[in-house]
Amino acid sequence: MEGLAIRASRPSVFCSIPGLGGDSHRKPPSDGFLKLPASSIPADSRKLVANSTSFHPISAVNVSAQASLTADFPALSETILKEGRNNGKEKAENIVWHESSICRCDRQQLLQQKGCVVWITGLSGSGKSTVACALSKALFERGKLTYTLDGDNVRHGLNRDLTFKAEHRTENIRRIGEVAKLFADVGVICIASLISPYRRDRDACRSLLPDGDFVEVFMDVPLHVCESRDPKGLYKLARAGKIKGFTGIDDPYEAPVNCEVVLKHTGDDESCSPRQMAENIISYLQNKGYLEG
């Protein structure tokens, strides 16, 4: 027998603790479990508990003597009081940024490239993921280190708790933007490929990085072309009313105004090939010095 788990079931047990508001009598606020090592419980007590149907240990004590707690444990008291007032949702305080002994320029020198974020945005079916893969491969062949954050892939892990509601979409973009920023700081060329329909969300991600390190790539493909491709069958479902809030159908897509690269669909197979589009992005990165240490 390794230990004993005792369940507390909100009994009407009243208690007082010397120095912590002895006159305050309150019920335990919630059910809970108290796990004790078997060695710390006398054999007779273990037998008593095992045979009892009405044993109710105290699960918690609600302390009301804040003055005494504050006097004796000021730091702990402040944390407890803040957590109580804000249900644990208050932004963390008393945190300090720790500088690294290796700076971004050191990592970029090692990799012989400069970190940045290539943010590919456009309608579903515009070819974002395809171009992202082509770009990653082309840069890899040049000896450059990249990492791709695909919108669908990220929702399998980091953002699996998010839906497609407007506020969740904003949080989805925010998280990906923060992760992309970390990759860029390492010196990696981070390729983010996702619809990201709202300008304010894309601009918020841009503001996370130094000027020039956010390269917005707009897949300028007409809706009718994207809908004719419909690789996932989502447009068909949206038209049938089975998907609500689908970008381009019953939710807007806000095209970039001053993006760095526009990949426009012209109908010409050669100029619209994923490889050629990737080369257009690489030309921009090359001209801006991102492919050099």
Swiss-Prot record:
User: What keywords tag this UniProt record?
Assistant: Amino-acid biosynthesis, ATP-binding, Chloroplast, Cysteine biosynthesis, Kinase, Nucleotide-binding, Plastid, Transferase, Transit peptide
Name of this chain's protein? Adenylyl-sulfate kinase 2, chloroplastic
Q: Where is the transit peptide?
A: 1-59
The tissues in which it is expressed are: Expressed in root vasculature, root tips, leaf epidermal cells and funiculus of developing seeds.
Task: Name the CDD domains on file.
Answer: APSK
Site (Participates in a stacking interaction with the adenine ring of adenylyl-sulfate) at: 164
Lineage at the top is: Eukaryota, Viridiplantae, Streptophyta, Embryophyta, Tracheophyta
Q: Which reaction does it catalyse?
A: adenosine 5'-phosphosulfate + ATP = 3'-phosphoadenylyl sulfate + ADP + H(+)
Organism of origin is Arabidopsis thaliana (Mouse-ear cress)
State the similarity comment: Belongs to the APS kinase family.
| Binding positions for substrate per the UniProt entry | 152, 155, 169, 172, 195-196, 245
A GO cellular component entry from the record: chloroplast
